[in-house]
Amino acid sequence: MDNITIRDIKVFVTAPRGINLVIVKVETSEPELFGYGCATFTWRHKAVVTAIEEYLCPMLKGRSVHNIEDIWQTMMGSSYWRNGPILNNAISGVDEALWDIKGKLAGMPLYSLLGGKAREGVTVYRHADGGCLEEVKECISRYIEEGYRHIRCHMGTYGGNFDGRRQQMVKPEGAPEGAYFHPKMYMDSVIRLFEQVRKDFGWELEVMHDVHERLSLADTLAFTKELEPFKLFFLEDSLAPDQVGYYKYMREQTAVPFAMGELFTNPAEWKTIIQNQWIDFIRVHLSDIGGITPAVKLAHFCDAYGVRTAWHGPNDLSPIGMCAQMHLDLNSHNFGIQEFSGFTQEEEAVFPGCPKIRDGYAYVDDTPGIGVGFDEKEAAKYPAVDMDHSWLFARLPDGTAVRP
């Protein structure tokens, strides 16, 4: 079957969780052979769909499905300017689908194509959140009962709710609406949160926290030092992508492990901090860097410098995308941990073959390819939705916009 070519590329948008997911189907010259990939950029899903349907599909029809590397390089250079999240997600959908096809042709799961297993299960972590300390503690207790040993702890989502004190902030007259937060109140509430978590749950539980790039450089360093006594597994995304050079100074002044990369889209953003070993975990979102092909290269690059993987695994990632990451987790020598947001019953109906979770480990089966299917009829029950973007509009108490 050496002459198999791309016959067509189709794109689906479905929202079984109330979050828009973009799924790519690459059909081949063999009628029963096709592959699925994740191209989910939730906040710009229409732009991703257009990029695939209007640009990538016409360009790729008739090309051999075997030449994944050449196809990836061709897609990346096809618009001259490159490495933006819209194009990268479009590329990822095709790239993952081609790897899915290659696995089906070989009769092997993706992790075998990559070199086989380095471990039998994938350690995952969950998010514990709540509007107050008691709600967060209840969430942590529930996850511990389910067997999870790594939990990311927040109170009131990103920026916190300061134990209900958010309403104490006074905005200037005429200030726009947005997700207002007070840096000092936020930092204080997180310190109190971890004091209580360690008091109630001890030191065997591995805990994390995500700053979500919302603090100034000086506040970030001070906050990190305050967190040091709580022995976090890692502190996530302390700095914005255009400020990562500051990790040099943070590394010199604290022993807190750093995870970074959720917003990265190109190698220039991660190269220096990995080579200088300023971070401990790389946290990129696979589809935002272009899929499996660049992620494998990134994992190997990190391995040479002692940096472990902790791929971004939010709820706006399809089960196909999540499973693709878990195949890399099984294969990569330098795997650290996998973020996991769970699957709803609706998602499991749309995406048959979702990985199974037992006692804090994820397991993928030996189905050839990525291993997660896509029920097009079931997906049609959950059309695209208009999503609430308000949490993206972070603002300081005086109304100043804050961007991650």
Curated annotation (Swiss-Prot):
D-arabinonate binds at H212, E262, R283, H312, E339. Mg(2+) binds at D210, E236, E262. GO terms for molecular function: magnesium ion binding. It holds the Pfam family MR_MLE_N. Keywords: Magnesium, Metal-binding. One of its GO terms (biological process) is amino acid catabolic process. Belongs to the mandelate racemase/muconate lactonizing enzyme family. GalD subfamily. The keyword Metal-binding applies. This is D-galactonate dehydratase family member CLOBOL_02770. Has no detectable activity with D-mannonate and with a panel of 70 other acid sugars (in vitro), in spite of the conservation of the residues that are expected to be important for catalytic activity and cofactor binding. May have evolved a divergent function. SMART domains: MR_MLE. InterPro entries: DgoD-like (IPR034593), Enolase-like_C_sf (IPR036849), Enolase-like_N (IPR029017), Enolase_C-like (IPR029065), Mandel_Rmase/mucon_lact_enz_CS (IPR018110), Mandelate_racemase_C (IPR013342), Mandelate_racemase_N_dom (IPR013341).
